[in-house]
Structures are given as structure tokens and as C-alpha cells.
């Protein structure tokens, strides 16, 4: 899994959730936001990698949300990109 792909997926998840931890987002919405076809297998793999890093979590309903660490990382990435 490339770091670039992880960054794109984290950014999409954060933007769709309003950068708020715990706001559930569907995989299909993330796929659309990153320009992938529906049910692209890379997205669940990317989300699982983000989960392993403590940046995203899978809800019981199959939707994903940012963790507080994920929201903080996204803000840091945005601050860095804005320099």
C-alpha cells in the first residue's frame, strides 16, 4: 500500500466527515471522493492500513470513521501542505 494512496484515502475520509472523529462514512463515498470505481478493493485495504495505524476505525455497520489521531494527522498534513 503506497503512502500516497493512504494520504488520499485519509484526506477523503476526513473531508467527508468534516474532520470530526466518529462520523461514519461509507466506503462507496470514499471511493467516489478519490476517483475510484465503486467496490475498488484498494479502498478497504487502505482503510485497514489506516486502522492499523490508529487513524481510522470500522463501525459495526461497515462504515468507517476517523479516530481523534486520524483527525489530528489530517490537520497536520493540511497545515504542512499549506506552507
Task: Walk through the language-model features, giving the residues of each.
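Short alpha-helical segments that sit at the start of domains
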Residues: 1-21
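Short amphipathic alpha-helical interaction segments
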Residues: 36-52
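Short acidic, hydrophobic short linear motifs in intrinsically disordered regions
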Residues: 20-34
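Minor-groove-contacting beta-hairpin "wing" of winged helix-turn-helix DNA-binding domains
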Residues: 62-68
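Short, amphipathic alpha-helical interaction segments positioned at domain boundaries
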Residues: 69-83
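A short, conserved structural fragment
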Residues: 51-61
